[in-house]
């Protein structure tokens, strides 16, 4: 997909996605033989449920058909969310990941796995899990020190409600 087509699609679709209360996170056109697939990734601070995705999918489909932005050939439109282990690339992604465990690749080359506690314009306050029975520690991390960041899936984490109930018992 040329940059021009990508920019045109983003300009066309972003206001429509925004009007549905969602953020346009990504657009990808993939061609395999004669088949083309347009993948649109959406999200919001509250997450996007299936009804919201279906609504935005119908709106995008109508707009694309109306404008012929994908050209004459057939294509498949896929609309979805970023997934559980999403890469964090925008400030809003970090805000959405508060209380989540994240793997950071630092610009100095080190790797860090920590939970995001708070986010501000300059960086993050993190809780670094303790090693070998030690208590967790807090750490400040500036955005400029982050090369890459990706949310980690946790299968057995207690949520805040469970932790509060244990503390009260």
Curated annotation (Swiss-Prot):
What coarse category fits the chief subcellular location reported for this protein?
cytoplasm
Q: Does the keyword Cytoplasm apply?
A: yes
Q: Does the entry feature the keyword Metal-binding, yes or no?
A: no
Q: Single Gene Ontology BP term? A: ribosomal small subunit assembly
Q: Which InterPro entries match?
A: Ribosome_maturation_RimP, RimP_C, RimP_N, RimP_N_sf
Sorted UniProt keywords: Cytoplasm, Ribosome biogenesis
What compartments host this protein?
A: Cytoplasm
Identify the domain of life.
Answer: Bacteria
One GO CC term on file: cytosol
Protein's job:
Required for maturation of 30S ribosomal subunits.
Q: Which PANTHER family match?
A: RIBOSOME MATURATION FACTOR RIMP
Q: What family does this belong to? A: Belongs to the RimP family.
Record-linked HAMAP family: RimP (MF_01077)
This protein is called Ribosome maturation factor RimP
């Amino acid at each position: 997909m040329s940059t021009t087509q990508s920019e045109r699609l983003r300009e066309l679709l972003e206001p429509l996605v925004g009007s549905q209360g969602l953020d346009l996170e990504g657009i990808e056109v993939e061609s395999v033989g004669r088949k083309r697939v347009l993948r649109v990734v959406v999200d919001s601070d509250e997450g996007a449920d299936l009804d919201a995705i279906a609504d935005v999918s119908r709106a995008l489909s109508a707009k694309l058909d109306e404008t012929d932005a994908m050209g004459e050939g057939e294509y498949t439109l896929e609309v979805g969310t970023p997934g559980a282990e999403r890469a964090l690339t925008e400030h809003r992604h970090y805000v959405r990941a508060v209380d989540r465990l994240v793997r950071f690749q630092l610009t100095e080359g080190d790797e860090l796995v920590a939970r995001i506690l708070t986010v501000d314009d300059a960086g993050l306050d993190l809780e670094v899990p303790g090693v070998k029975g030690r208590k967790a520690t807090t750490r400040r991390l500036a955005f400029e020190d982050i090369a890459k960041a990706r949310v980690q899936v946790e299968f057995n984490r207690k949520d805040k409600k469970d932790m509060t109930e244990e503390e009260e018992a």
